[in-house]
Amino acid sequence: MLHPRARTMLLLSLPAVAIGIASSLILIVVMKIASVLQNLLWQRLPGTLGIAQDSPLWIIGVLTLTGIAVGLVIRFSQGHAGPDPACEPLIGAPVPPSALPGLIVALILGLAGGVSLGPEHPIMTVNIALAVAIGARLLPRVNRMEWTILASAGTIGALFGTPVAAALIFSQTLNGSSEVPLWDRLFAPLMAAAAGALTTGLFFHPHFSLPIAHYGQMEMTDILSGAIVAAIAIAAGMVAVWCLPRLHAMMHQMKNPVLVLGIGGFILGILGVIGGPVSLFKGLDEMQQMVANQAFSTSDYFLLAVIKLAALVVAAASGFRGGRIFPAVFVGVALGLMLHEHVPAVPAAITVSCAILGIVLVVTRDGWLSLFMAAVVVPNTTLLPLLCIVMLPAWLLLAGKPMMMVNRSKQQPPHDNV
């Protein structure tokens, strides 16, 4: 017979698996629709019209129209496409289900139109809202926080294709003073994360790892080099942290989301023209292209890092629906490659992984997630001790510093009466 503790853990196992599968399927459907629309906007349509897809007019035009379209969705959809991601953490409170159709449409338009944001925040919002709404009907005795945790774990597993990230993140958030053992509390979230990851793996495999030269043996000088790289990435990220709330306040003085996002899309188009097509979209596929292109120089990598970081800030400040983690990883890769080109004696594995660690730490303020992203993009077990050591001075640098979010008290009210 099972111990009462085991029976308690099994109570939520079936709902956890169902939520993990559903979280993954929602992500897959949204990404597939966005991919089809992206192909139409950036491949078939310019080909039919006889226009180069990297034409400055096409890039500016598509991103401007994308901003206007997203603005119309936010202005007129019920619930105004959910909360502004610039004012929200990755895992937030559940939103009313009535806001989800507008949020999904706004996300798809942004992903397809080339906006420099990822899908993680809106998908997380959608999955949490659905899990809480449906779970409260089916199992009213389970509280909202349990459904929120299961949905966020399933989404994290689906996004990254592995339950490891969820295990790392929730090991700190669920580790309270309760007498219930940590792994008892992790059981159901890990079931959801595993179900989400396995479901995603049936359809496609998230490809984060880059073909970076293997790193052999750690030396003492490598720790210093890695700490310096992480500090440079943190400094770049903190510039974005300073700019985001100020640009957000300035943009939203115009009140009308169609105007705000139209102007934001136009600015993104100009940045896209300067950075080229590789600086568009969420950044995961584009960082593969960046690494594969042997023609890029130090100045090219620097330009891409600056443009992508600026595009991330503009997109978030304008109110586009999307997440900041994936484009931040692109910025980290570009910074790392730039520093390696500038100082070839420092291995690319160190510069890239430590730059990712630093910039993702700025964006998320989550040490485990930052370590995870650095480790999966540059998969090398020799790097793990170095990354753990480099994390320490990086965490000290960011202690007490503002986060990459707009203060909720300064958030503009919904556009109900605009």
From Swiss-Prot:
Keywords: Cell membrane, Ion channel, Ion transport, Membrane, Transmembrane, Transmembrane helix, Transport. InterPro entries: Chloride_channel_YfeO (IPR022969), Cl-channel_core (IPR014743), ClC (IPR001807), ClC-type_chloride_channel (IPR050368). GO terms for molecular function: chloride transmembrane transporter activity; monoatomic ion channel activity. GO terms for cellular component: plasma membrane. Its main location: membrane. It comes from the Bacteria. The keyword Transport applies. The chain crosses the membrane at residues 10-30, 54-74, 99-119, 120-140, 149-169, 186-206, 223-243, 258-278, 300-320, 322-342, 343-363, 371-391. The keyword Cell membrane applies. It is a multi-pass membrane protein. It is found in: Cell membrane. Pfam families: Voltage_CLC. Belongs to the chloride channel (TC 2.A.49) family. HAMAP family: CLC_YfeO. This is Putative ion-transport protein YfeO. The gene is yfeO.
